[in-house]
UniProtKB/Swiss-Prot annotation:
Disulfide cross-links: none
Source organism (scientific name): Wickerhamomyces canadensis
GO molecular function, one term: endonuclease activity
The name this protein goes by in its record: Probable intron-encoded endonuclease 1
Keywords from the UniProt entry: Endonuclease, Hydrolase, Intron homing, Mitochondrion, Nuclease
Single GO cellular component term: mitochondrion
Entry's Gene Ontology BP terms: Group II intron splicing; intron homing; mRNA cis splicing, via spliceosome
PANTHER family, alphabetized: PENTATRICOPEPTIDE REPEAT-CONTAINING PROTEIN OTP51, CHLOROPLASTIC
Amino acid sequence: MMKKQIINKKDLLGLGPNSKLIKDYKKQWTTLSKIQEETLIGNILGDVYIKKLKRNKHFLLQFEWKNKAYIEHIVRVFDEYVISPPTLYERKNHLGNKVITWRAQTFEHKAFDKLGYYFMENHKKIIKPDLVLNYITERSLAYWFMDDGGKWDYNKKTKNKSLVLHTQGFKKEEVEILINDLNIKFNLNCSIKFNKNKPIIYIPNKDYELFYNLVNPYIIPEMKYKLLFNV
């Protein structure tokens, strides 16, 4: 019996999406690994777009960050689904200032459909009541924080260890669900705050050590700056 040949990703460069070789390559993968799924849940709560283009049957992922090391790390996590390396992208913001980011994306694949259908409704991310209790792990929380977390107090001399998760893209009611269940599952004392009338999750100073210990094992070195104080 002949052993099935493994298709190398390098052989796909320059091929169109309808290439037989690409279609055969995709068939080698069926589902996300546990690490990939936990990572992606945090990414979707953050900055990653999971979308289905009109011509596609399945979902794909789109990544965009300023931090090159971080996008390179994420591309490695989803390596088998990403053909091309991150590319530099320049644009001007609403103030006319130049913004430089790095972009990458996966090809569309059925492995993303489970979370695509779970999170997306009418092309918009939604929060379901069982998300935190049934899906979010410490790893998910860490990637959510690396994507869309930061410090509360930007005073350089501050001793305030409070943190925030930026959830401005979600409804107030959805953020309240997230807060309630994060507090239950991880024994936190999060509360809701508002930034320009949009809801964000506030992690108080007294929770810093607990939160640090939850996420620190998964924070990559280039993103450690987000954890302001060592424990």
